[in-house]
Amino acid sequence: MTDQPIPETEVLPATHPKRSWVARFFRFSRNLLLLFILLSIIWVVSDRFLPVFVTPLMVIRSVESISHGEFPKNSKKWVSIDEISPNMVQAVVASEDNLFLHHHGFSFNDMSKAFEHNLQGKRIRGGSTISQQTAKNVFLFPDRSYLRKGLEAYFTVLIELIWSKQRIMEVYLNVIETGDGIYGVEAAAEEHFGITASQLSRSQAALIAACLPNPRRFDAGHPSGYIQRRKNSIVSLMGKVEQVNFNKIIPPATRKHKHRHRTS
């Protein structure tokens, strides 16, 4: 008998379970991030054309009412920007974001002032632009975490790239909380003054704007002395800030399609 050669066995490379697990985790995280980016872009693009009827804040307020044994009040009515008085647009620009037409979503000057103000131990003040507030109201739950602020910045960039300034203002004025269970300036005008948003005077628009920092505490229909003083200040500012005219905005290259709404 002759000895048969022993076949060589293939030596497989040693596997490292820990490295394999880490690689799978990073692949999963990458795919999850890409999915989030894709879905968020689709969401923002769809909201560029469709009315926004429900926001996370509306859901939270409804759940709070139900938990207290109350029937949730949800007064809102979507209207286009040309059905809203220019006085209302001017009032929120004067009171909330006087550089709205010129910035690209962020006002670093206002953010710096708010930071210095808060460091002095005074009443906490935000430095959010109308674009940031719109991103927060439409896409996010109210929260003060760094994650939420990061997502707010992300969605702010998206709407500034995909929406026009006119659309940002239109959505903002339709979804902001303007009272207890009241959302948007059309519902606020009807609730507080018995008129439509297109009929708002400078004084009425300024009253609504004056209550925006805390609309569940203050009532534009029955203003306190503080709200009256704040209203007078806003009316004065309305005459000083640049007149809002969306037709005069030169859109960036990414904004190729302009909304065809009246602004007068």
Go through each PLM region and give its residues.
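Juxtamembrane regions of bacterial inner-membrane/periplasmic proteins
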Residues: 2-264
